[in-house]
Amino acid sequence: MKLIENTEFGGERPLFASHDIHLDNVTIREGESAIKECSNIVATNCRFEGNYPFWHVHGFTIDNCYFAVGGRSALWYSDHLTMKNTVIDAPKMFREMNDIDIENVEINDADEIFWRCNRINIKNLKLHEGTYPFMFSKDIRIDGLESDSKYVFQYVKNAEIHNARITTKDAFWEVEDVTIYDSELNGEYLGWHSRNLRLVNCHISGEQPLCYAHGLVLENCMFDASCDRAFEYTTLNADIKGHITNIKNPTSGIIVADSIGSITLDENIKAPADCEIKTRN
C-alpha cells in the first residue's frame, strides 16, 4: 500500500482510479470527486473540504477524519466502508451504499444521510439536525445512538436498535420488521403505519403514539403522561409497565398495563374491534 502523507489536493479528481493507497494527514481542498472510482483506500487524520470525495469506492477505511461543510454528499455508490472516530459537518452523507461499519462518529448535519443503504452496523453514533436519516435503508444493527434529527428511520426494513435516545416526531413510519431495545423514544406520532415493530424495555413519550400499526409488540415498556390516544387502529400485543394516559380504538390484540387513565372505544372503531384491554391485579 502506497503512503501519501502531509500534503493536500484540490480541483477535479486528483486521485481518480487510485488503488491500494493510505492517505495520512491529507487535506482535500475545494473541488470535486477527489477519490472517485478507487479501491482499497485508507484515510487517517484527514480533512475533506471538497464535494463528493468518495464516490464509487470499493473497500475503504476512514479513521479520525473530519468532513467540513463543503465536503457534502461525500460517500455515495460505494461499499465495504469502515468509519471510526470521525466528525462530519456536511449533509447528505452515505447514499446507495452497502456494507457500512460505523463506530464513534458524530454527524452535525444529518440531513438525508444513510439513504437506500444496505447492511449497516453502527456502534455509538450521534446525529444532530437534518431530516429523514436512514430513509429506505435495510438490514441495520445499532448499539448506541443519540439523535435529534427529524423523521428518522422512515421506510426502514429489518433493523435492530439498542440503547438509543431519539427525539423527533414521525419516527419509524412505515417500517417493517424492526426491534428496539432499552431505548428512549421521544416525539409525536411514533411508529405509524408500521408492520412488525417490536419495542422492548423502552420509554415512550409524545402524543398519539403507535397508531395504524400492524403486528405491534411491546414488552415491558413505559409511557409518559403525554401519550394520549395511543394505538388507534392498531393490532398489537402490549405489556405496559406503569400507567398509560389514554388508549383509543385499537383494532385487535391484547393490552395489559398496571393502570389506565381512560379508554376510548367509539363508533369509529374498526373491525374486528376485539382488542382485550386490562389492568394487572
Across the structure, where does each feature detected by a protein language model lie?
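Long, distal/terminal scaffolding or interaction modules
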Residues: 1-281
